[in-house]
Amino acid sequence: KINDKSLERILSFRPRIEKVAIKDAKLRTFITDDVNRDELVKHVYDITYGSIKKTDNLVIVDDSIVRGTTLQKSILKMLNRLSPKKIVVVSSAPQIRYPDCYGIDMAIMDDLIAFRAAIRLFKKKFRASSLEDIYKKCKKENKKVPTKIKNIVKEIYNPFTDNQISKEISRMLKDEDITADVDVVFQSIENLHKACPNPVSYTHLTLPTTRLV
């Protein structure tokens, strides 16, 4: 139980906050076309050397992790140069599992890192033919009128917990040249509903079409 003394101790705790990464506000990697994105992410951010020690855990907050391109190609490599013990990436949005995220250039599911992580886990656990069966069911489902379409793609995600997919995303984002431990933490759908009880739409998180391509 929390008493006055323990509450005071909790409230007196202050995490150290530094401007470790500096971003050029004029450059936007999310809305850049696929051909130029990888090159652009190399130039968007810079870091403040000496802001953390090698024994520090570094926590960074992102509004969402969609493709994971900027994290993998730029941010993690850049922050790793500061030699933190661990980098924790906190996403205020849940895992984005389906296309048309925010309506911006998201027509291909394989662009989504959550989907790619689920596919990797699925291939480790099941036969390749099982994934092919789901694909065929999706193609068949797409012949129906929109009001009759069922979400077959969930069969790829259902065998795994959110945490298992998050751990796989963490492994995918950590390249061999990253020496720090990397952990990715996502907001949950349940807690998002608590934070935003009257949302306009969560379709890119929970209610997709069945297209795999």
Task: Locate the predicted segments by residue.
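Short, glycine/charge-rich flexible loops or terminal/linker lids adjacent to PRPP-binding catalytic cores
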Residues: 1-57, 69, 97-110
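A conserved beta-strand->alpha-helix junction
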Residues: 9-29, 126-145, 184-190
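Extended, hydrophobic alpha-helical segments in both membrane/secreted and soluble proteins
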Residues: 57-78
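Acidic, Ser/Thr-rich peripheral helices and adjacent loops at domain boundaries
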Residues: 101-126
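Extended, composition-driven regions rather than compact fold-specific motifs
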Residues: 138, 156-163, 176-177, 193-198
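Conserved small/polar residues in nucleotide/adenosyl-binding loops
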Residues: 203-209
